[in-house]
């Protein structure tokens, strides 16, 4: 078995799917670790082509020989909630001004999509996490 490469850095970024380019914030974040920026951009864009329009978080592991691997996560819960509720952004004062509504089915669908990244044992616990995020954004969850 080949010896394990030594990890020199872990970079977490949220990038629009299929739209990675060497401009900030991607270029500087990768450049300071010595990663080939264009190589990452091409690989990321190819991997996220089918999810255009979503923000996809990525965790890039950089090794000492300047090679890298990356893991794609599911889109942030807030982004999925905004899309489902049809609002551009959450409320500035969430507990007084409500900006949208979500049904229990929509919350459950988002929870199923996010399940792999959430710290929840079952779909009901995941739904509660998503409902809490929605409430803190000023979006009402119908019972």
Curated annotation (Swiss-Prot):
Keywords for this protein: Methylation, Ribonucleoprotein, Ribosomal protein, RNA-binding, rRNA-binding
GO cellular component, one term: cytosolic large ribosomal subunit
PTM comment: One or more lysine residues are methylated.
Biological process, per Gene Ontology: translation
GO molecular function, one term: large ribosomal subunit rRNA binding
SUPFAM superfamilies, A to Z: Ribosomal L11/L12e N-terminal domain, Ribosomal protein L11, C-terminal domain
Tagged with keyword NAD: no
InterPro entries: Ribosomal_uL11, Ribosomal_uL11_bac-typ, Ribosomal_uL11_C, Ribosomal_uL11_C_sf, Ribosomal_uL11_CS, Ribosomal_uL11_N, Ribosomal_uL11_N_sf
PROSITE patterns in UniProt: RIBOSOMAL_L11
Gene3D superfamilies: Ribosomal protein L11, C-terminal domain, Ribosomal protein L11/L12, N-terminal domain
Subunit (UniProt): Part of the ribosomal stalk of the 50S ribosomal subunit. Interacts with L10 and the large rRNA to form the base of the stalk. L10 forms an elongated spine to which L12 dimers bind in a sequential fashion forming a multimeric L10(L12)X complex.
Role this protein plays: Forms part of the ribosomal stalk which helps the ribosome interact with GTP-bound translation factors.
Family (UniProt): Belongs to the universal ribosomal protein uL11 family.
Protein name: Large ribosomal subunit protein uL11
